[in-house]
C-alpha cells in the first residue's frame, strides 16, 4: 500500500504520506536483543511481552521508511496545544483532509481503516518566512496554506485496502467486520475515525473542555462528527462508525466548510 500511495508524493500531488525507503526479511532475534537494551521504553516492553507469548513469527519483514522528527500527532498535540493558535489547528486539519481527498479522488474505495491520531506522524521545521504560503490544488480547487513549520504524514497502513487493487486479509476477518473495518467504499470512515478518536478517552479527551482550544476548532469537529455519530448505536465501543453512509467527504469539507474559508482564493 505504501509503495502505491507514494506516487502521490513523487508526482507532487501531496507531501503528506510517509515515503518507504526499503524492506527486507530477517530473523526476529536481533530486534529482541535490541529491545532489551531499551527497557525503559513502554513500546519495547509491549514488544517483548508479545514475543514471550509467541505472538510473533521467527522471521519478520522489516520496513525502512522516511523519518518524521516530531513524533506522532497525538504526542505533538499534547505537548503543544497550550500555545497553538487557530491558524495552526486549521493548517493541520487541512493537511489531514487534503491528503485523504487526493487519495480518494483516484481511489474512491480507499480506506486507511485505522486513522487514529497516533498513526499520523509529524515533521517539524523552522519557519524562516512567516508570510510564505503553500499552494495546494485539491481536485481542481486551489488553496493557499500558511507555513506553520509543521507537516503531517499518514502512516501505518496495516488495515488499509483498496478493493480490487490492494486486498488485505485483515479486513476480511469476522472480528473486523463487526466493527466495520471492511473493504467497502466509505469516504467518511477515515475522517470520522480520526476526529472521533482524537477527542475520546485514551487520546485527547479533554479537547472539549480546554480553554486553550479555540471554539472555532471545537465547532468544526462537531460539524464533522455530530453527536449522533460520536457515540451510541451508530458507533462502536472504540469510536468507529458502524454504517457506510458518506455523511461528509474530505473534499466537500475543504471546498465548503467555513473553517477553511481563509485558505480559498477570493472570488
Model-derived features: positions:
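Conserved kinase catalytic-core helix
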Residues: 5-6, 80-112, 117, 126-127
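Structural motif at the C-terminus of the N-lobe alphaC helix and the adjacent alphaC-beta4 loop
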Residues: 1-17
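Conserved structural core of kinase catalytic domains
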Residues: 15-87
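Helical subdomain adjoining the active site within ATP-dependent kinase catalytic cores
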Residues: 178-267
Amino acid at each position: 500500500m505504501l509503495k502505491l500511495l507514494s506516487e502521490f508524493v513523487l508526482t507532487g500531488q501531496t507531501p503528506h504520506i510517509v515515503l518507504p525507503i526499503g524492506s527486507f526479511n530477517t530473523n526476529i532475534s536481533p530486534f529482541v536483543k535490541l529491545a532489551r537494551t531499551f527497557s525503559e521504553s513502554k513500546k519495547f516492553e509491549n514488544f517483548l511481552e508479545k514475543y514471550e507469548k509467541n505472538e510473533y513469527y521467527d522471521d519478520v519483514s522489516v520496513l525502512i521508511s522516511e523519518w518524521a522528527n516530531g513524533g506522532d500527532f497525538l504526542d505533538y498535540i499534547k505537548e503543544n496545544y497550550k500555545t497553538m493558535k487557530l491558524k495552526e489547528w486549521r493548517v493541520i486539519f487541512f493537511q489531514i483532509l487534503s491528503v485523504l481527498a487526493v487519495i480518494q479522488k483516484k481511489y474512491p474505495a480507499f480506506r486507511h481503516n485505522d486513522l487514529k491520531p497516533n498513526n499520523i506522524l509529524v515533521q517539524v521545521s523552522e519557519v524562516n518566512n512567516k508570510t510564505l504560503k503553500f499552494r495546494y490544488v485539491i481536485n481542481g480547487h486551489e488553496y493557499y496554506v500558511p507555513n506553520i513549520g509543521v507537516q503531517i504524514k499518514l502512516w501505518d497502513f496495516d488495515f488499509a485496502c483498496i478493493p480490487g487493487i490492494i486486498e488485505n486479509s485483515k479486513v476480511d476477518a469476522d472480528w473486523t467486520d463487526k466493527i466495520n473495518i471492511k473493504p467497502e467504499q466509505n469516504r467518511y470512515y477515515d475522517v470520522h475515525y480520526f476526529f472521533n478518536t482524537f477527542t475520546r478517552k485514551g487520546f485527547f479527551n479533554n479537547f472539549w473542555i480546554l480553554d486553550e482550544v479555540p471554539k472555532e476548532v471545537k465547532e468544526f469537529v462537531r460539524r464533522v462528527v455530530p453527536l449522533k455519530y460520536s457515540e451510541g448505536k451508530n458507533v462502536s465501543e472504540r469510536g468507529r462508525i458502524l454504517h457506510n453512509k458518506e455523511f461528509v467527504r474530505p473534499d466537500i469539507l475543504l471546498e465548503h466548510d467555513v473553517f477553511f474559508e481563509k485558505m480559498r482564493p477570493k472570488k
